[in-house]
UniProtKB/Swiss-Prot annotation:
The protein, known as: GTPase Obg
CC cofactor: Mg(2+)
Coiled coil: none
Organism: Chlamydia pneumoniae
Quaternary structure (record): Monomer.
């Protein structure tokens, strides 16, 4: 299950108690204080990693707790400190304080770490309180409690290419073709209920690092107002470097394909006004349903209505025209 939002309580460990103890040796009946300090409690640290893709591991968890520090011991022995708890989250995670809404950190780099809940300090044993005046202190202090923090985690996928389109525009079929993987395909709305990630290999430069492609669930009119799957998935376009609009141009009895693109542009602009700063390409999909002269007429219609956009005629089903996508990706993404 793809989980991209979660609330957790992160509890650091309590510090161990200091102890009162006395040095006891045969020839030192009054050997003085010998109680050790308590160990520090473990802290809770969040770490970003590219090896996990969602918060599924924490789906049924309300809180995570680091170990407590151990109490001190005789012979001036300090208690063992609690081990820090490392919470692994996907790169692209936005961390907020659940109580204030304050953004604490934006994890965009693999290996980034942030200490979120500090472990409690260990208490002091009576040896710590020995002075020239008080040579036999009977005082020891308890360990301090660890910090407890309620946080919200929100994932915004980091991908090179994001497939954007209405339900049943053929995004999943095209995704399977480009990423050489399989996601569920069907002729009904919202076949894709969660973003799918795949890798696209550059055909002309096989030594190059693959591109990450994301199949964003179908957008409907009013998505920016949280209709359909709405805002839950619109946010996944925010960090995508290149947007690939997928438009169904097959013969059908509904809105014109041009109106579909107009609506998609409106929805994305309403959610992220500066989205057009990204590289964009429009794939006119399902041309296997059109005759050659109809394909050319379709292309000219789009070019006339949207002169600032780049278009490619393709069939995700047959693979026709897909090489044009690879060429565009190479021009815009290859380094």
């Amino acid at each position: 299950m793809f989980v991209d939002q979660i609330t957790l309580e992160l509890r650091a460990g309590k510090g161990g108690n200091g102890v009162v103890a006395w040095r006891k040796e045969k020839y030192l009946p009054k050997g003085g204080p010998y109680g050790g300090n308590g160990g520090n409690g473990g802290s809770v640290i969040i770490e970003a990693t590219t090896s996990v893709y969602s918060f599924e591991a924490y789906r049924n968890i309300r809180f995570l707790k680091a170990p407590d520090g151990q109490s001190g011991a005789t012979n001036n022995r300090t208690g063992r400190s609690g081990k820090d708890l490392i919470v692994s989250v996907p790169t692209g995670t936005l961390l907020r304080d659940a109580e204030t809404g304050e953004i604490l950190h934006d994890f965009t780099v693999d290996g980034e770490r942030l200490l979120v809940s500090q472990g409690g300090k260990g208490g002091k044993g009576n040896t710590f309180f020995k002075t020239s005046v008080n040579r036999a202190p009977t005082k020891a202090t308890p360990g301090k409690p660890g910090e407890i923090r309620q946080v919200e985690l929100e994932l915004k996928l980091i991908a090179d290419i994001g497939l954007v389109g209405f339900p049943n525009a053929g995004k999943s079929t095209l995704f399977n073709t480009l990423a050489h993987t399989e996601v569920k395909v069907g002729a009904y709305p919202f076949t894709t209920l969660a973003p799918s990630l795949g890798l696209v290999l550059c055909k002309d430069r096989l030594y190059q690092k693959p591109w990450i492609i994301a199949d964003i669930p179908g957008i409907i009119e009013g998505a920016h107002q949280n209709k359909g799957l709405g805002l839950d998935f619109l946010r996944h376009i925010e960090r995508t470097l290149l947007l690939l609009f997928v438009i169904d141009v097959s013969k059908r009895e509904r809105n014109s394909p041009e109106e579909d693109l107009e609506t998609l542009i409106h929805e994305l602009h309403s959610h992220q006004p500066d989205f057009e700063k990204k590289d964009m390409l429009v794939a006119l999909n399902k041309i296997d349903d059109l005759l050659p002269d109809e394909q050319e007429e379709c292309l000219q219609s789009f070019q006339k209505r949207f002169p600032s956009y780049t278009f490619v005629l393709i069939s995700g089903l047959t693979g026709e025209g897909v090489d044009g996508l690879y060429r565009f990706f190479t021009q815009r993404l290859a380094v």
